[in-house]
Amino acid sequence: MAIGVKRNAGSSSDGTEDSDFSTDLEHTDSSESDGTSRRSARVTRSSARLSQSSQDSSPVRNLPSFGTEEPAYSTRRVTRSQQQPTPVTPKKYPLRQTRSSGSETEQAVDFSDRETKNTADHDESPPRTPTGNAPSSESDIDISSPNVSHDESIAKDMSLKDSGSDLSHRPKRRRFHESYNFNMKCPTPGCNSLGHLTGKHERHFSISGCPLYHNLSADECKVRAQSRDKQIEERMLSHRQDDNNRHATRHQAPTERQLRYKEKVAELRKKRNSGLSKEQKEKYMEHRQTYGNTREPLLENLTSEYDLDLFRRAQARASEDLEKLRLQGQITEGSNMIKTIAFGRYELDTWYHSPYPEEYARLGRLYMCEFCLKYMKSQTILRRHMAKCVWKHPPGDEIYRKGSISVFEVDGKKNKIYCQNLCLLAKLFLDHKTLYYDVEPFLFYVMTEADNTGCHLIGYFSKEKNSFLNYNVSCILTMPQYMRQGYGKMLIDFSYLLSKVEEKVGSPERPLSDLGLISYRSYWKEVLLRYLHNFQGKEISIKEISQETAVNPVDIVSTLQALQMLKYWKGKHLVLKRQDLIDEWIAKEAKRSNSNKTMDPSCLKWTPPKGT
């Protein structure tokens, strides 16, 4: 065996090292067919703390270089501490045993004389790691036990080699869309999943991002995306210029550019076609008969080009938001989200996830009794339930009735199951709702429409029994089949009607959903314009408006600011009575045919509850 001089590779930069002895043994493996004739196995032993008997049994016990009076320097590679310009006094360390390509005799060598020279020429390279790089430390040397056998060392080397050879079989890293589903494809018939409605992606896997569904090509989507980006850059540049030219005032008037843009939009909307020609109608009918619901209807010439362009931008933005959610893993194929619900004579598409039990959520389609709100798994179960269900209206007390419209007050403590089912149903259409099961501290006001089959759910709102912040609404919902018919405003009006009876000033609990915020702003605007239309005095008080309408003063001020009716002049706050807005509101009220979509205070039979 050849024995050379070598420093341990695991020594620290300050010149300290472990004084372990390592002996490399050479072995011949004749069973391998690849021609490998030698393998090295490193066996660790105890270091300077070995007893004298073990030193006597060492194979190098008779070497003259191991004198106890003259310690020797071990050779090693240059470390960071030795590369510094300041001279370092060399320390002396006990000589280590290793293999050398030179003579078989050992000698003490001063490392300070050979700090730029390698100590030995190795006849074979060190074993490779699974990544193909040589080990830089003692990571591949087992120092846990001094009695490691030779067979275990060979087995370890073989496992390292096998693990390195298996790396080529690892699957490639998936990119982009493959990161959330590898086998997805667009559900539109005839679509190859190429392109995206936003023009920013190469592939799509949903109808919302399908160019073919929107009667476009992938190239057209890219051109539109470039046009949108260019318009956004121009708008941002113009906003910066406006900000630089403006002075900091409390109420900033519109700039000249904004006024010109408003006039331009008004002119573009005047160019709207009065109607479709006969050829266009035939073209639209042919398109509908050919593709049915698998393609978007043709939208050209239905409205002005400006409004159609706004709609296309909104579509692209919504598609981009959905794509981000999919890439983040929030929307995945096969996720436990109910897609549709069978509710009475309607089939409703859901908007958000609701925490129904897993055995129901995984179905994708839920069947629900529209009277007791019990949810079921199949049409057969629903049919059997409807045959024996005795409920035809919500539980609780009917506190309002005018015509076919009724409102029921349901106590969450007395009718816990019904209120929990109502909250789970509402979560399918509300994003910010967090109340599902703790319904006892709340009262629910359910609005229904009656016919010969029963009282059908229109919507509801809930409120705390004891609200310290005077919230008159905690959650409000209008069912999708009754939206855009005035029922949402009726629910809001009814909540303020209850506040008037309680002689309180109320406000909805925040945050509001997007549709809820639109409804409340429209209601506050209507209330203020009606009040100003009937007001004949010269001085007005926000507090008086609040007490008469039961609207919170903060909501009144924000609405006046949005209408540009609140000004600050010569140290005083002024409310401008804009007659143009009042006349516009009067004209809209005259055109409304559904005058019955209002709440009549005389039809309310209710007294405020005392305590809980």
Swiss-Prot record:
Listed PROSITE patterns: MYST_HAT, ZF_CCHHC
The MYST-type HAT domain, residue ranges: 333-608
Cross-link (Glycyl lysine isopeptide (Lys-Gly) (interchain with G-Cter in ubiquitin)): K339
Pfam families per the UniProt record, alphabetical: MOZ_SAS, zf-C2HC, zf-MYST
Localization annotation: Nucleus; Chromosome; Chromosome, Centromere; Cytoplasm, Cytosol
Chain positions of all zinc fingers (CCHHC-type): 177-220
Cross-link (Glycyl lysine isopeptide (Lys-Gly) (interchain with G-Cter in SUMO2)): K324
Superkingdom to which the source organism belongs: Eukaryota
This protein's name: Histone acetyltransferase KAT7
